[in-house]
């Protein structure tokens, strides 16, 4: 997420046989065998955009028949150059524009969650992957 609330979206290739052909999605992908979800998200983001995440946080989970989608977020640092290495393009998009883009129905709800998380004070942003542990 950029500081102005725009989210980075990837325009998927319009090729039969891939997931979400021709749709706008959050960058992502599949986990490698034995890979932790957060590590996979960092790897996929770097593979698809050349962006190296440093403060990735779990946002939400979406259960599916064949598993689940996990969504992570972090604020874009504004320094690293983004490069589209998969798909037709990358674009920072504001919430209103998303409504008119070809997308999965859940994208707008996840976008809203990311906006809410971004507005939270930092001490409320802990997740299961980086929240302080309590001894009992």
Each language-model region and where it sits:
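A short local loop/turn or secondary-structure capping micro-motif enriched for an aromatic residue
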Residues: 16-19, 42, 80, 91-92
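Charged phosphate-binding loop/patch that engages nucleotide di/tri-phosphates or the phosphate backbone
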Residues: 108-136
